[in-house]
Each structure stands twice: as C-alpha cells, then as structure tokens.
Amino acid sequence: METMGRHVISELWGCDFDKLNDMDFIEKTFVNAALKSGAEVREVAFHKFAPQGVSGVVIISESHLTIHSFPEHGYASIDVYTCGDLDPNVAADYIAEELRAETRENIEIPRGMGPVQVKQAKAKAQAL
C-alpha cells in the first residue's frame, strides 16, 4: 500500500548516561542522522533538563526526528518520521549506534493512506 510517510519508533535501552545527558552531542547526532538519510534540515530545537535529560526535535523538509532521553534509566525514546523516498531506518540506526544502545526495539508505522498496520522495523543488527 502506498503511504504518505514512514514512522519508525525506537525504544533504546542500555545507552551511555553521559551521551544521553549531553545536549550538544545529541543535537549533533540528530542533525547528522537526518543528513545521512538524505533529509534537508529546516529547524533544530533541543532542551536540557535539570538534573538530567534532553528532549529535542530536528524538523526536516520530509518530516521530523525527535528524542526524549532518560539518562538515569539508560533509556531514550526516538521517533523518525519521513515522507517521500527517504528510509527512516537509516537515521534510526545511526542514532542507536551513536548512543551505544545495548537493546533496541522498533516498530514502523505507515502513515496517511489507510488503516494503520504496525510492523517491526528492520533495525540493523547490533552486537551486545
């Protein structure tokens, strides 16, 4: 079925505390992830929480990438939504690698053209 976009939702566990708590590192990682997927970056907004955690969004011409990090749990929730021919898994894989995620669960949701059919996203295999 033809869709308007692909939305990958990643649950990242066992991530490095310092990386999850470093707003500049996360911002750079997300911009690089967007560029590696072939996206055109439009806007970038990130916020550092006290005592820890980062939330942010990279708006791309093709949609968006978001993160909410919980360093105290080694956890990050990631969304990568792309329209057109871009593969959101390219960006999601890069982010998981950069955050050194030990465990990753993904789902991919086709958006905008009919009933939602949730499927496991094809995540790049990672050695633990």
Curated annotation (Swiss-Prot):
Known EC number: 4.1.1.50
Active site positions, chain numbering: 63, 68, 83
Pyruvic acid (Ser) PTM sites in chain numbering: 63
A GO term from the CC aspect: cytosol
Transmembrane segments: none
UniProt cross-references to Gene3D superfamilies, sorted A to Z: 3.30.160.750, S-adenosylmethionine decarboxylase domain
Primary gene name: speH
Record's comment on post-translational modification: Is synthesized initially as an inactive proenzyme. Formation of the active enzyme involves a self-maturation process in which the active site pyruvoyl group is generated from an internal serine residue via an autocatalytic post-translational modification. Two non-identical subunits are generated from the proenzyme in this reaction, and the pyruvate is formed at the N-terminus of the alpha chain, which is derived from the carboxyl end of the proenzyme.
Protein's name according to its UniProt entry: S-adenosylmethionine decarboxylase proenzyme
GO MF annotations, alphabetized: adenosylmethionine decarboxylase activity
Cofactor (UniProt): pyruvate
Function according to Swiss-Prot or TrEMBL: Catalyzes the decarboxylation of S-adenosylmethionine to S-adenosylmethioninamine (dcAdoMet), the propylamine donor required for the synthesis of the polyamines spermine and spermidine from the diamine putrescine.
NCBIfam families, A to Z: SAM_DCase_Bsu (TIGR03330)
Any Pfam family: AdoMet_dc
Marked site positions, Cleavage (non-hydrolytic): 62-63
